[in-house]
Amino acid sequence: MMNTGKQKPGKRYPLVNWADGMPVNKKHFIQLEDHFTDRLCEYQSFQLNRANYGLLPFRKGEAVSGDFSITELVTGTLEVRLKRCLALTAGGYLIDYDAGGDDELTASFHIAIDETEDKDQRWDVILMADPFERLPSGIPDEKETSPRQPDALPNYALSVVPTGQIDGNNLGRHFLVIGRLRKNGNRCEVDGNFIPPCTSMSSHPDLKNYYLKFGQLVDSIEKASSDILAKVENAEKQTPLAVNIGMLCRHVMLFISDIYFSYRNEGQYYPPLRFLNVFSTLAHRLYVCLGFMNKEEKEDLLKYFNEWNGINPGAYEGLLRENSGLLYNHQNIRPLMITAERFLYQFNDLWTTLSQIGRASCRERV
């Protein structure tokens, strides 16, 4: 005889215990649908973590995945209007909202008088999607004797809360921060600097621009490394400075060769965390390379860099340390991109300058 074990009760949406001859009504089908919806969300959530949920890549013909605006009513109340949103919540639920020709989803809020004095006031725009609360939709079929709207849509709700009041990483499985508002003088506007949680570098226009921009900088750094190394190898005299610069160039070129194919073909689909890992690792490798040199050689190298692009030795090492030790925050992506961008621009500027130094000048020092 088979011993059938009992599971612990308490599932949010249990299966229906079907039996022959049982009375059936719509509640049973709703329970069944809720069970599989919940299971699908939970299965999807197993593939998610704190760094790969959020806005999805926008569809062809659309400029953004989360489109909302803000207007001020004559009463002084501020109203946020959501036009569309395509995203994946941390709980694995797909948000696919498009107002189309219907009324847009709205949320109203009012700024208290004492808050208007805070010049740095910001508010998070949060979208809630509840697939278990259905809203009737569609045009009734005239052939049905009992008129009803044939379709059902998930319930969506929009809210606006002061930034920092709620931790975006712990909102719950059906909530998502989709944008931010900020004060600009005496009025509020959409904060264009804020990048909400995104599943990939193709989920936000600014992230796509970072992907393209960083790719161009990588190409430039690789070419400059090759040119510098050629000068070092062809120099009549191999000084310690020349050897160390050549060593840095080799490490840079080997690193780029390791990531180039993947970055070129998959980089635009990387989650922001994986994307930043590429450049944080490059900075860390350069920082480690400095540690290969003795104290005098490192000081000589950093002084040489300072002569050609004005970065003082302490600032250069600090730049490498800052990018090596990035702490990723899915709710605050922009500052991390700016940090990586600053490193790449300064390193590219230095390397490009060194690659353009004339041979005579190169032989004098290198």
Locate predicted features:
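Elongated alpha-helical scaffolds
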Residues: 105-141
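Short linear interaction motifs
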Residues: 9-12, 97-115
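Mixed-charge (acidic/basic) macromolecular-recognition segments
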Residues: 3, 143-282
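Extended, amphipathic alpha-helical scaffolds
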Residues: 266-366
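Basic, amphipathic N-terminal segments
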Residues: 69, 95-96
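N-terminal "first-domain core" detector
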Residues: 6-83
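Short, solvent-exposed secondary-structure capping/transition elements
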Residues: 38-45, 96-99, 132-143
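Short polybasic amphipathic segments
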Residues: 83-88, 178-181
